[in-house]
């Protein structure tokens, strides 16, 4: 059974109007039966940039409303290009992470001593490269006992 078919989709054989309609009317006709809004991009780079700009827009909206922006971040391969674009935007002065609170949504447990966890990857890809307050970064650590994990995550 093939599980990764996304790389086999040939958008050059499908008219662009079926996945990137020109106007609101075509978009409405194309998506009228969808229950979940979906946007299709020709490549993962374009999709990653779109998602990063969407996240940055949310951060800026929360900042304008004088409130924190709470993000739940994963560390899967699909997120790496999004984080790279967010770092680029931060370095260009397009977004600030000063009002952001981050929760790591998937940490290995128990994490062996010296083993890299998802939090170390999140830090490497994003968190140490932007101006997020370390006190606003939350992840179950190695020191949380099995009995206390639920209470910690609460």
Predicted regions and their residues:
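Acidic/polar N-terminal loop/beta-strand segments that form early-domain functional surfaces
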Residues: 41-43, 74-76, 105
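Generic structural signal for well-ordered alpha-helical scaffold segments
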Residues: 52-63, 87, 91, 123-127, ...
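Glycine-rich N-terminal segment of FAD-binding domains in flavoprotein oxidoreductases
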Residues: 65-92
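N-terminal glycine-/serine-/threonine-rich phosphate-binding loop
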Residues: 2-70
